[in-house]
């Protein structure tokens, strides 16, 4: 199992798919990285040499924010919004949807399980 950016990536999958196991690397960035390093599309992780794994590591370290750094940056951005007291910050603080979705009937993922209200039965 190859270890890239602190993540054990699966050995039996193709490189483009396996790279997507790293937080912050999606399909587009995975393709970009493999193209930059010069790895064919169909190559599997178990077929990679140590030099190729090292090249992938260097390409990721060089140009992409992944894993802990990315999570930290997102958390800092959300905290900044909350400290500013802007509308988006207030929505984050109250654990409500931030991007204008309706909350009267939906938004259960963000709000959590429904709370029972005494005397409210139809």
Swiss-Prot record:
Q: Name one Pfam family in it.
A: Ribosomal_S13
Gene Ontology molecular function: any one: rRNA binding
Q: Where is this region: Disordered?
A: 97-122
What cellular component GO annotations does this protein have? Answer: cytosol; small ribosomal subunit
Subunit info? Part of the 30S ribosomal subunit. Forms a loose heterodimer with protein S19. Forms two bridges to the 50S subunit in the 70S ribosome.
Q: Main role?
A: Located at the top of the head of the 30S subunit, it contacts several helices of the 16S rRNA. In the 70S ribosome it contacts the 23S rRNA (bridge B1a) and protein L5 of the 50S subunit (bridge B1b), connecting the 2 subunits; these bridges are implicated in subunit movement. Contacts the tRNAs in the A and P-sites.
What this protein is called in its record is: Small ribosomal subunit protein uS13
């Amino acid at each position: 199992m190859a270890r890239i950016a602190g993540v054990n990536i699966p050995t039996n999958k193709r490189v483009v798919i396996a790279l997507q196991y790293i937080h912050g690397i999606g399909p587009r960035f995975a393709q970009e990285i493999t193209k930059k390093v010069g790895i064919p599309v169909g190559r599997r992780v178990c077929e990679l040499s140590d030099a190729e794994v090292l090249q992938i590591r260097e390409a990721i370290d060089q140009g992409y924010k992944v894993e802990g750094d990315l999570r930290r940056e997102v958390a800092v951005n959300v905290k900044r919004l909350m400290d500013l007291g802007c509308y988006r910050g207030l929505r984050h603080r109250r654990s409500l949807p931030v991007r204008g979705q309706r909350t009267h009937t939906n938004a259960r993922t963000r709000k959590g399980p429904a709370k029972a209200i005494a005397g409210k039965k139809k």
